[in-house]
Amino acid sequence: MKFIDESLIRIEAGDGGNGCVSFRREKFIPKGGPDGGDGGDGGDVYLQADENLNTLIDYRFNKRFAAERGENGRSSDCTGRRGKDIILPVPVGTRAIDNDTKETLGDLTQHGQKMLVAKGGYHGLGNTRFKSSVNRAPRQKTMGTPGEKRDLLLELMLLADVGMLGFPNAGKSTFIRAVSAAKPKVADYPFTTLVPSLGVVKVDDSHSFVVADIPGLIEGAADGAGLGIRFLKHLERCRVLIHLVDIAPIDGSNPADNVAIIESELFQYSEKLSEKPRWLVFNKIDTMSDEEAEERVREITEQLGWEEDYYLISAATGKNVPPLCRDIMDFIIANPREAETQQVAPEEIKFKWEDYHQEQLAEYQFDDDEDWDDDWTEEDDDEDWDDDWSEEDDEGIEFIYKP
């Protein structure tokens, strides 16, 4: 299956249903009064993390997703049905970004975690809501509000404990093949690895960790050289970075300069990522004697001014690889993953009587102290509501305004 770690989609929440203007019309019930119902709320759009997915390929061609609109209100005080929500499944580790404002809406880092990304519109109010002692035959209603619409950028960021860094052909894929069941392609030319891959390293019966391999970086990657730095985002959630260094590059370059280039590209991408714990692991010591390897590594660390610990391994032969894996496991146990996001409590489902509705009602409020009936006369009392109505009256209709 093709690995897709980024997709731009259009999401549209449902509009709220409109309120209804209606009056009760029944035989022997004069002046039935208003009975127009409220509309239904529009459907919401959610993202939900699914551990069974590992790519965003489902959103490569299908780009538009719209929730259902709320139904309009009806007579007899019938409220319109709420629009159906839509839930879009995404891989664990997906980040949602508003493409217009560049605002990060949230990260989905746990299986089953759900996130609201577009809110449905509020329902409109029927004329029943506007009746009062001074407004007994209201002909007002409100319209439903539009649902949220946005262009949503989905970014998949792999969840791994350990991230591999290094120049092309440093031996990253060979290392993963040696310590896990993952089988990334290995060849003697640069950029053999084109997409990130994951491997599970089992240290013993009860301990294991996940390692991520990304395509190699070269000088100028921040400006788009090589495969660029687009895959560095997959290392943002790693707890430790393993910087694999070829102590005998086939192109004759200086390993110390190669390390400095990677450090510079990391910093240009993200200062936070450059500050993560990073271990230097010198690979391919099988290409020379132990004495030569130790002397070469000593020269490299002196040029770098590296004062922390480092490792000498051969990913091809497995030499010194098990001790490195055990040290990584000890580090992971001693440094548990910090919570990426706070688990949001499920949204309380309630009838949405919000400020929007209060404002709409306020526009039609009448002051009870107003002398609205000072000009009343006995003649007005004779002006009844359709007193001459009968079953043969074809002009009697139920809806005065039909949305």
UniProtKB/Swiss-Prot annotation:
Q: What is its main location?
A: cytoplasm
Q: Where is the composition biased (Acidic residues)?
A: 365-397
Give the residues the record marks as binding GTP: 166-173, 191-195, 213-216, 283-286, 314-316
What Gene3D superfamilies would the database entry show?
A: GTP1/OBG domain, P-loop containing nucleotide triphosphate hydrolases
- What enzyme class is recorded for this protein? hydrolase
Q: Provide the GO biological process annotations.
A: ribosome biogenesis
Write out the residues that bind Mg(2+): S173, T193
Where does this one sit in the cell?
Answer: Cytoplasm
Please provide the record's keywords in A-Z order: Cytoplasm, GTP-binding, Hydrolase, Magnesium, Metal-binding, Nucleotide-binding
A GO term, aspect molecular function: magnesium ion binding
Family, similarity comment: Belongs to the TRAFAC class OBG-HflX-like GTPase superfamily. OBG GTPase family.
The name of this protein is GTPase Obg
Question: Which species is the source of this protein?
Answer: Haemophilus influenzae (strain PittGG)
